[in-house]
Each structure stands twice: as structure tokens, then as C-alpha cells.
């Protein structure tokens, strides 16, 4: 389920110090005594709440469903909104079953919107073991022209309701044969890892968790100047590109971005970037987070296969990274994910 690419906030944060005016002689945060520049606050309690629990539940149940025995399903109450259910169904138009409208032992999360309007709502209140006929109509924009706008009948049997996370069994997860995922807790973490890359809620939350971390940290008045200078170069290059695109001077572009002047813009952006990287590395140091050579190589190869590059070397050259600079970028991503996983979910 793991994607192996990088979250948007991590990429923006790290590349500000990894790419600068074509120079590859860039200092590395993992070689810096960051604790002399930053004092961490209580990052286990950032006060953020992530509205992703329904997504976590749906994905966990979907994966769990593929390996659970039917006798572990619940049958003693009617279906409710938010339940995951195992169903058999057959769809008919004018009394004739249509292609793609029949399945046995299918997983469905009630309320997910996976099926056409009325299908999932029609199962709310149905007891496991019961069969119902649902008179429905396909939307006019449905991609199958033979069914678009047509009235159909789905005959659906609810077989059982899937267990909630607290009722899932480690033995079932272990029996699925997934590498390094042998417990329910590990399954949840893997699902969260997947959502980190694909959920819009978590994408937006990356910025929130970074700002919350900066708010509870204390920074030295004097930041490491080499790092500030490198960040400043990158932001100047970026500002020049934006100014050229919009036909502005760099001073005008900086003011359009809310700064009083170009100098103010570059100073503020560079120093904020350095503070963010210092805090991230400090968390990594305290938590023992690292990126091994094997992990780095695997992620580089995934990045190559996901793009239009023929080799790791071509990928690194395109983004002007050394392997160690890319390792630093992956570390920022890992810390962001770690911090998000600590937050409350609803």
C-alpha cells in the first residue's frame, strides 16, 4: 500500500535547502548540532484533530475483508450508516441481468458513495441474512450508455457486518501474508501511510502540523548562516521565475506576495524554512528516525519508475540532488508523517 513518493509539504520544505542555483555543495541538517539552535516543545500534543477516521475505517475494513472468515462477521443487528458490509447483489434491467451488475461476497462501506444513489441508503436497517429489492435509476451521465438514465432493480443480500477496528483480530491480519503487517495496529499504520499520499485532508494537514510544530519550539536568535544563505538563494531564484512569468520586477512580485519589499520577503521565507528544517531534524534525532541505504535506494527507484526517468542518476541530475540531499528530503517526509500519526482523528 505504500507509495514511496513524497508529500507536498515535505518536498517544498526540504527542496528549499536542497536545490540552490545549481550548487551541490549544500550543508546537511543531519550533520548539524541542531539542538543548539532549537528547543523542542511537546510535539506529542500539537492540538490538531484530523478528520480522516472514516477513511481509515473504510480502508482497514476493505483490506481486512479480503482475509477474514465469514463467521467473524456480525449478524445480530441491522445495518447502519458507516458500516462495512459483505453483500451479494444482482442488477436487472427489464428483468434481465446486465453485465457488471452481479457480485458475491463484495465489500461495501455504507455511505461511501461507491454505488449509485439509493443503493447504500436502501441497505440501512436491513438485517444480515435478509434480501431486499432496490428500485433504482442510473444517472443520465453514467458511462455505460445502455444503462444511463435507465430504471433497474438490484436484488441485494446482506451477508454480514464487518467488525470495527477494536474487534479485528491480529491472527487474521497475520494470515494475509502482507510483509511487515502482522497486527491490526500495523494495518492501521499502513493505511495511514497510504492516506498520507492520497488523502486531501492529510495533504492540507501537513502544513498545519509544520506550523503547529514551529509554534511550540523555541529557536536561537542567530540561525546557522550557511543554511539561511542557501535557502535565500533558492527563494530568490523562485521569485525571479515568478516575476518573469507575470512580467514584473522581483520587487513587485514580492509585494504581490504580501511582503513590504523583496529583501523582507527573502529574509522571512529563508529564516522560516531553516526553522522548519531545524525542528524536523531535532524530532528525527530524538525519535531515532533515519533513512537507511536500502530504504533510500528503494525510494529512488520508485521515484524513477513513477516518472519519465531512465535511471536514478538521471532523476537526481534533473532535480539537482545528491543521494544524501535526497535522503534529507525523505527524512523530512518521514518526520511529517510521524507527527501526523500522533494527532487525534475523528
Give the residues covered by each predicted segment:
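Sec-dependent bacterial lipoprotein signal peptides
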Residues: 1-19
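FKBP-type peptidyl-prolyl cis-trans isomerases
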Residues: 21-346
Amino acid at each position: 500500500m505504500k507509495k514511496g513518493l513524497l508529500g507536498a509539504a515535505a518536498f517544498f520544505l526540504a527542496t528549499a535547502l536542497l536545490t540552490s542555483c545549481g550548487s551541490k555543495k549544500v550543508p546537511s541538517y543531519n550533520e548539524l548540532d541542531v539542538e543548539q539552535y532549537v528547543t523542542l516543545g511537546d510535539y506529542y500534543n500539537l492540538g490538531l484533530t484530523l478528520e480522516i477516521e472514516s477513511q481509515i475505517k473504510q480502508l482497514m475494513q476493505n483490506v481486512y475483508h479480503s482475509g477474514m472468515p465469514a463467521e467473524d462477521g456480525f449478524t445480530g443487528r441491522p445495518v447502519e450508516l458507516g458500516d462495512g458490509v459483505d453483500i451479494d447483489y444482482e442488477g436487472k434491467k427489464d428483468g434481465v441481468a446486465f453485465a457488471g451488475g452481479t457480485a458475491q461476497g463484495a465489500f461495501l462501506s455504507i455511505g461511501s458513495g461507491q454505488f449509485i444513489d439509493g443503493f447504500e441508503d436502501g441497505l440501512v436497517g436491513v438485517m444480515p441474512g435478509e434480501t431486499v429489492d432496490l428500485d433504482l435509476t442510473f444517472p443520465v451521465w453514467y458511462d455505460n450508455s445502455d444503462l444511463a438514465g435507465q430504471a433497474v432493480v438490484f436484488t441485494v443480500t446482506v451477508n454480514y457486518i464487518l467488525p470495527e477496528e477494536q474487534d479485528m483480530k491480529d491472527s487474521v491480519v497475520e494470515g494475509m501474508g502482507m510483509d511487515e503487517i502482522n497486527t491490526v495496529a500495523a494495518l492501521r499504520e499502513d493505511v495511514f501511510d497510504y492516506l498520507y499520499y492520497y488523502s486531501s485532508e492529510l495533504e492540507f494537514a501537513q502544513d498545519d502540523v509544520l506550523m503547529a510544530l514551529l509554534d511550540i519550539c523555541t529557536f536561537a536568535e542567530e540561525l546557522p548562516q550557511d543554511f539561511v544563505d542557501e535557502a535565500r538563494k533558492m527563494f530568490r531564484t523562485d521569485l525571479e521565475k515568478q516575476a518573469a512569468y507575470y512580467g514584473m520586477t522581483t520587487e513587485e512580485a514580492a509585494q504581490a506576495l504580501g511582503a513590504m519589499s523583496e529583501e523582507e520577503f527573502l529574509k522571512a521565507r529563508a529564516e522560516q524554512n531553516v526553522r522548519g528544517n531545524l525542528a524536523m531534524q531535532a524530532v528525527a534525532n530524538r525519535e531515532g528516525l533515519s533513512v537507511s541505504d536500502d530504504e533510500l535506494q528503494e525510494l529512488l527507484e520508485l521515484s524513477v519508475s513513477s516518472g519519465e526517468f531512465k535511471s536514478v542518476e538521471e532523476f537526481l541530475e534533473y532535480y539537482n540532488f545528491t543521494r544524501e540531499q535526497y535522503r534529507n528530503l525523505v527524512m523530512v517526509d518521514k518526520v511529517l508523517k510521524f507527527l501526523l500519526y500522533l494527532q487525534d482523528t475523528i
